[in-house]
């Protein structure tokens, strides 16, 4: 089973909406579970997160944090989820995770990705390989990746 944590309030910025759509479209590939009939469950806040951890999480579940940061680099719903992970230190034991962080400006995305990675790790979640992908407002940090893959910066991130 794949859980996608996408904490956001209010209107969804277009690029973030595209990010979530891309994650959901590829949910079966990410989860690797061909028998899984439900491709993904969306977790929007700490209540959804705790409910999933307590009732729906199975050994080997995958969890993807797809996070949008505003200009200030703050996402209050995300902080509430991180707080719950700190209180329930084994809530993600046996899970595998990935992190995608999208931001409105050039700051905060890498710092937030590291905070999420730390909390996931403390909660027992395994983060293999390249743990996170982050996109700054201009997508300048995707230039090298795009050049290597012969894509636009936007295509490289998605």
Spans of features found by a protein language model:
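FMN-binding flavodoxin-like domain, especially the glycine-rich phosphate-binding loop
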Residues: 1-158
